[in-house]
Amino acid sequence: MAQERRGSREDRQNREERDSEFVDKLVAINRVAKVVKGGRRFGFAALVVVGDQKGRVGFGHGKAREVPEAIRKATEAAKRDLIFVPLRGGRTLHHDVNGRHGAGKVLLRSAKAGTGIIAGGPMRAVFETLGVHDVVAKSTGSSNPYNMVRATFDALKNQMHPKDIAAQRGMKYATLQARRVAAGAASEE
């Protein structure tokens, strides 16, 4: 029987090729302590955002006794939990959207070409790994990086492609696009 063994050279090469397409950003690193009978055991917790800069992004959390191991665990967790976000023109969001997690609230707004990423710390890392070039984001409430990242992902999960919105409303995509163009022209006047 000619079955491939787990951990074969081809398997490792495929995994390395798959991993090389992703960009990862370290969002936060914390020193954590576990209290045991003899005192405290110190370790590290890492929050990492991973994306392919083409619309797929994920975040992960990892804990270990050493920093590199915590980052590796967080990166693997992020790669296991990727979401796809439809982008307009491969550069911005299709529509404005709100997200929240705990006390953290975020507002994400699509922006014109050339605007850049106007977002604070953890949200900026999410947009850079997602592949968004133009976006305006505002976070209120909690400034905890974990809550900000989770609130941003909550908002991104609610992002819908106009074709899906048209299908949901029972109208044609062209009609929806015509309304969008007309609304854009009216707002410029």
Swiss-Prot record:
Family note: Belongs to the universal ribosomal protein uS5 family.
What gene, per UniProt, encodes this protein? rpsE
Q: List the disulfide bonds.
A: none
The species this protein belongs to is Sinorhizobium fredii (strain NBRC 101917 / NGR234)
Q: Which superkingdom?
A: Bacteria
- Offer one Pfam family short name for this entry: Ribosomal_S5
Q: Could you give the domain comment from the record?
A: The N-terminal domain interacts with the head of the 30S subunit; the C-terminal domain interacts with the body and contacts protein S4. The interaction surface between S4 and S5 is involved in control of translational fidelity.
Give UniProt keywords alphabetically: Ribonucleoprotein, Ribosomal protein, RNA-binding, rRNA-binding
State its role.
With S4 and S12 plays an important role in translational accuracy. Located at the back of the 30S subunit body where it stabilizes the conformation of the head with respect to the body.
Question: Which parts of the sequence belong to the S5 DRBM domain?
Answer: 22-85
Q: Under which name does UniProt file this protein?
A: Small ribosomal subunit protein uS5
An example molecular function term from Gene Ontology annotations: structural constituent of ribosome
Would the keyword Iron be found if you checked this record's keyword annotation?
no
The record ties this protein, via InterPro entries, to: Ribosomal_Su5_D2-typ_SF, Ribosomal_uS5, Ribosomal_uS5_bac-type, Ribosomal_uS5_C, Ribosomal_uS5_N, Ribosomal_uS5_N_CS, Ribsml_uS5_D2-typ_fold_subgr
Its Gene Ontology cellular component terms are:
small ribosomal subunit
- BP GO terms, sorted: translation
Self-association and partners: Part of the 30S ribosomal subunit. Contacts proteins S4 and S8.
